[in-house]
C-alpha cells in the first residue's frame, strides 16, 4: 500500500529489511481515520456520527476496500457517492426545517431537479443566513468544510465516473486526504441537521 518499501540502506536493500516511505511517515503521524485500517476507521466514524446512514456506511466501507486494494478511482467514486448521499440527507433536513411555505416549495423543486450545484447553492445560502443571524448557531468553519469537501469529491467523482479519453491521474496521497476529510464533513453535516431539528430557518 506504499507505506513501507524493502531495504533500509545501500548495504541492506532487500527484505527482510524494510523502511517507511515518505508516504508511510505521513500515514503513521495520523491517529484516527486511517484508510489503511478499515475496521478502526469505521469504528471511529460510528463514534463521532450518531445513527449514521447505513447506505453511507456501505459505500464508505466499499471505498475503504478499494483504497486498500490500490483501486484509487473506484475508491474515489464510492466516496463521492457516500458524500452525495450525506448531502442529500442534509437537503431533506433543510427542507423540513424551512419555516416559509413558499421557500419550502421552491427548495422542493430544486431537490427534485438533477442539479447538485443548485441544491448546494440553496443550502449554502441558507446556512450563511443562519450564521449571520445567530452567530453561535453553527461552527465558524461550517461553510468552508461543506464547500471544500462537497466540491472536491463531486469534481473527482465526475472525473472518474464519466468515460473520457484520459484517465484521471489520482495519487494515493490525494485519496488518502479525501478519506481523512470525509468524517469531518459528515460531522459538520450532523451539526447542521441537529440545529435544523430544533430551529426553523
Region locations from a protein language model:
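Glycine-centered, phosphate/nucleic-acid-interacting loop/turn motifs that mediate DNA/RNA or nucleotide
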Residues: 2
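Charge-enriched, short contiguous segments at helix-coil
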Residues: 5-16, 135-201
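Short, flexible/disordered secondary-structure transition segments
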Residues: 5-6, 93, 97
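Charged alpha-helical initiation segments
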Residues: 12-73, 180-181, 195-201
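Amphipathic, non-membrane alpha-helical segments in soluble helical-bundle scaffolds
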Residues: 14, 46-53, 72-76, 113, ...
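Short, hydrophobic, well-ordered secondary-structure elements
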Residues: 60-92
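Flexible secondary-structure boundary motifs
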Residues: 97-150, 196
Amino acid at each position: 500500500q506504499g507505506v513501507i518499501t524493502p531495504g533500509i540502506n545501500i548495504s541492506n536493500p532487500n527484505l527482510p529489511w524494510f523502511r517507511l516511505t515518505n508516504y508511510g511517515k505521513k500515514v503513521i503521524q495520523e491517529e484516527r481515520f486511517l484508510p489503511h485500517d478499515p475496521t478502526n476507521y469505521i469504528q471511529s466514524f460510528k463514534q463521532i456520527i450518531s445513527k449514521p446512514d447505513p447506505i453511507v456506511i456501505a459505500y464508505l466501507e466499499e471505498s475503504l476496500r478499494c483504497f486498500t486494494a490500490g483501486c484509487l478511482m473506484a475508491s474515489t467514486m464510492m466516496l463521492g457517492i457516500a458524500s452525495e448521499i450525506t448531502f442529500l440527507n442534509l437537503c431533506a433536513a433543510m427542507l423540513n426545517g424551512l419555516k416559509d411555505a413558499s421557500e419550502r416549495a421552491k427548495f422542493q423543486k430544486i431537490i427534485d431537479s438533477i442539479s447538485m450545484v443548485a441544491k448546494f447553492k440553496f443550502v449554502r445560502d441558507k446556512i450563511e443566513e443562519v450564521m449571520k443571524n445567530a452567530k453561535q448557531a453553527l461552527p465558524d468553519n461550517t461553510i468552508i468544510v461543506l464547500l471544500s469537501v462537497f466540491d472536491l469529491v463531486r469534481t473527482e467523482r465526475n472525473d472518474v465516473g464519466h468515460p473520457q479519453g484520459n484517465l484521471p491521474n489520482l495519487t494515493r496521497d490525494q485519496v488518502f486526504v479525501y478519506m481523512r476529510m470525509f468524517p469531518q464533513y459528515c460531522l459538520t453535516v450532523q451539526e447542521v441537521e441537529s440545529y435544523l431539528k430544533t430551529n426553523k430557518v
